[in-house]
Amino acid sequence: MASSEIEIVSSESKQIPNGVAVNVIDVFSASAYGDFDKLRKFVEEDKASLSTPDGNGYYALQWASLNNFPDVAQYIIEHGGDVNQHDNVRQTALHWAAVRGSIAVADVLLQNGGRVEAADVNGYRAVHVAAQYGQTGFLNHIVAKYRADFDAPDNEGRSPLHWAAYKGYADTIRLLLFRDAYQGRQDREGCTPLHWAALRGNIEACTILVHAGTKQELAVKDKAGFTPAQIASDKGHRHIALFLSKAQRAQSNDWKDKIRSGKMGDVGLAPVLLSIILILIFLFINSVIAAPNLPKVTAVVGLWGWTTLSLAVGSIMMFYRCSSQDPGFVKRLGDLSKDTDSEDPLLNIDLNNSSVWTGNWSQLCPTCKIIRPVRCKHCPTCKRCIEQFDHHCPWISNCVGKRNKRDFFIFICLATSSSFLAAIIAVQRVWTAAQSLHIEESWIRYVVVHHPGVVAFLVLDVIVFIAATTLTTAQASQIARNITTNELANSIRYGYLRGPDGHFRNPYNHGCRKNCADFLVKGYTDDNEIAWPPLQQVAVSSHAKIRNRAS
């Protein structure tokens, strides 16, 4: 690749020395360690200056900012420290605060005249440094509260989104895209954020950028003539190259590319499934029930035949419902009434609560511009966020979510029942017809030769039965446990599916009876979490179990 690798802001001079005993000898070490009493002594008794740098050119205010000591920072400012004073590379205290996400210090600096857009020799502002270190909360804070420019380029033309993509900070990418950062920006080397994510092999970063972007970003070439997919392939990231190439084909207008990528637009495979159902009904009526070379239909066979046809018609009705029904789309920002003077929706996120912090950043949807519910997921095919997202089913050309899961479950139950009964009736019909079979002729040969329509029906029907039974069993098990297909597939990634002890725990499992009752009555299972015992109680319980086993 023609472009040189991005050089991260040097943090070598910002590390606090490790050691058991802290040797506070001057205002700089006192500021770095937050020793307020010694700092006051140095300033008020020893008359030490807070406006001069140390031997390396760094200021006391920078050290206090790096380690998030707001009271120390306030004292330094009140006693001669310049809030906008910069070091040899023109970095201010705000740059240092951004390295470790020191939000409290940032408030002190900016409320005392600090310049939020101050840039160092590389053109890095605080927003760039925050993106380089993945300090999503800090970045959001200075953007929401102090109107920092989150899309500003540095001297090389790279925005914070370039940096977040290069470093692979998925939450920071989500935040920037949520705030409409321009992902089509090319730096001096012609690289977009997607180029940098592909270069480093960051699959999650690439996925977020592709889902939130357009086909133009996939086709952009850098100055060396490489697209993101070609860069990924050149660097040996074959899985990313395959993903990007597939995404590019899916967004192509060429129908051949769409078929190769498995994306057939909004239609999906629903017409195929509907055709299979109609073919099965046609074969069942003409080749099984009304075939002239089969025995006359008895009353019992006729009753079960009509029952099977009724179930099949019911499955078509439910197929239409779960295909056309809203699966639980969450309203997008554009669908909501917007008040230009309203408060920033991300300003009041509680960063002191670690569970809320983690959940909120991962819940930002940069495409729909919403803070989605915990069990919600963005579907790249439907291009919408779905409540209680289970999976996207190409056979119904729709997602399965909170509002259509009951219809989907009824549909597959009806499909299972009708295919099972139809197979039994078909076997019974040909078995009865084989009573006149010649001794020298095998039963299988007789059926294939004399009743090819029944054979074709049974082959297709058995395939449908196996698929429908497997899906029905899986869905029934998940409904009983109040967990979705998506949650089972991503249980390691989702923090809310881990208990206080770090092991898998489903916070929504209220017991089989309640889960099933909620699903049957309301059409969806409950989203209310059950309370977990505190970690100490879990530890005591675990030790008790170990002692009992030992005894």
Where are these regions (language model features)?
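Ankyrin repeat boundary/linker residues
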Residues: V20, D54, D87, D120, ...
